[in-house]
Structure formats: structure tokens, C-alpha cells
Amino acid sequence: MERAESELHYDSPFHLLIAVILSAQCTDKRVNMHTPQIFARFPSPKELAEASFDEVYQLIKSISFPNNKAMHRIGMAGKLISDFGGEVPSEPAQLETLPGVGRKTANVIASVIYDKPVIAVDTHVFRVSRRIGLSDGSNVEAVESDLTAGFPAHLRGKAHHWLILHGRYVCTARKPKCESCGLQDLCREYRLNNLCL
């Protein structure tokens, strides 16, 4: 993998926050198809906070869970204005106070925008970490803890993106591409099975 960075398109911390929230249970490719119109209509939290549910819904209706995401986007924008002066906060704990923002989203924003030494664990990071042997954790929190302990602070952001991309394109959920994986010699699952899962 040449570049370990987000595949989501964005031009500001606020727009990355929108994109990451929309990406839950949806592909980055689909989110990127819709974000140009969303970003043009909502350049800042003010415009989004003032928008109607129907207006937001129409822009995101082909993204998974549009009802919840539309409500959360409007609430999130309002809280950014009321609690954070319209700025996206840098601390994960503050980010998690925003509607629709959980630990994974908070860690993505803190890492990508503010270079905080945190690792966001999504389905790809969880799967790859357990398969290759970086963690034996049975839940997201345990895997995050293991990865945080296992990677130096300055590499955690890159590790997060590398694990995501490796999970999307090589160590896929179904039919992983073990034969073309550069980690065969290091991979616990490959060593145990000596074949694809």
C-alpha cells in the first residue's frame, strides 16, 4: 500500500466529520459520490444546523441509515455551534458528545485532523488485527488497547489507515488474498492454516 491515508474526500475538519459519520455501514466510494453536493450546501455548521430534516435527507437518502444520519447531522452541527463555537473539537472525549459521533469517529477525527496518537478500530482494523496477530481482543475496546500499546504514538495514525486499507483490498472478510499478501510470514492465521481462511 503506497499511501496510508483516508480515502474519504474532505476540505475541512467539519467536512471530514460529516464524511466519517456518513461512512458508517457505507463505503467511502459511495460517500465520496455525495459529499461534493453536501459540502457545497453546508460549508459550515451554521448552514447545516439551520437545515430542515427533509433537505438533509434528500442529499443522503442513498447512503445507509439516512433517517438517523440526517437527524444526527443537524444535531451535531447545532452542538458544534452551541458548545464549541462552530469548531470541530480536537479531543476524542469532546467529539463523543456530538450526536452521531462514537469512539471510532472521534478517534478518526482526532487522528487525521489533529494528529492525536489514537487508533480508530472499525470492522477492517478489528479483523486484520486479529488475523495477523496484533491482538487477541474479542471486542473493539480490547483491540484498540492492544494496538495503542503495540504501536508507537507517532505511527498510530498511519497504522490505522494501513490496517483499514489492508482489510479492504487484501485481507478481505471473504476470500482474503493471502497469496498476494506481503505479510504471509508474519500472519498468525496464515501460519496456522497455511491457506486462505
Where are each of the predicted segments found?
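Catalytic cores of DNA base-excision repair glycosylases
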Residues: 1-197
